[in-house]
Amino acid sequence: MPEGHTLHRLARLHQRRYAGAAVAVSSPQGRFAAAASAVDGQVLRRASAWGKHLFHHYVGGSTVHVHLGLYGTFTEWARPPNEAMPAPVGQVRMRMVGAEYGTDLRGPTVCELLDDAQVADVVSRLGPDPLRRDADPAWPWARITKSRRPIGALLMDQTIIAGVGNVYRNELLFRHGIDPYRAGRAIGEAEFAAAWIDLVDLMKIGLRRGKIIVVRPEHDHGAPSYGPGRPRTYVYRRAGDPCRVCGTTIRTAELEGRNVFWCPTCQT
């Protein structure tokens, strides 16, 4: 599932390419047809992201809300000059076309039209987003320090911190030597403060570079990444491999429905 930095990159791209002008919105698949017709030809005021949620805000008060889920993707394309639009490929839930570019949305978990009150309701259920300037770490700390749940589960809870996915969760805990099964209330305030600052920095790098880069330069060598074109990780998808720092075998288990990875020596 795309993590928060990906949605912020999409919001910035759509802001740059489409905001401030009328756009054509359609639903080749048909499932979003009625909502698409409501904003077709309207001016896109701005695009924004909160955690893993993307919002297209239109002049007039309507907002398209998208959550990509596990399988959703946007495909961006340049509009052919003086030519017919390219035929949709696959099940395109929403197509948005501006003066120079178009984008096709496929496979989202959510693609819906909301009014301002409904947008506020969605956001009210989310924790602070580390990539937003208004993010207040006091909110997640207040929840975490009272909880018996494992910190590895709390970091993935979007009502506590919005935008953290499985890669950032596992890698952040390794970087700070925290066992993912340690209870939230056993996390020290200084530990959390340092981890929050690091999380903000890491996600900003992801936003800027378009990749999740978490391995420090002094450890960025040796065994290759878990996938082609992916930067190295410390623990994510490295179960059975030696730790890049101490050599201990990386472990994995299921934690609240998602795989967690950790080094039993480096993380306590």
Q: What is each model feature region?
A:
Residues M1-T268:
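Structured catalytic/nucleic-acid-binding cores of DNA maintenance enzymes
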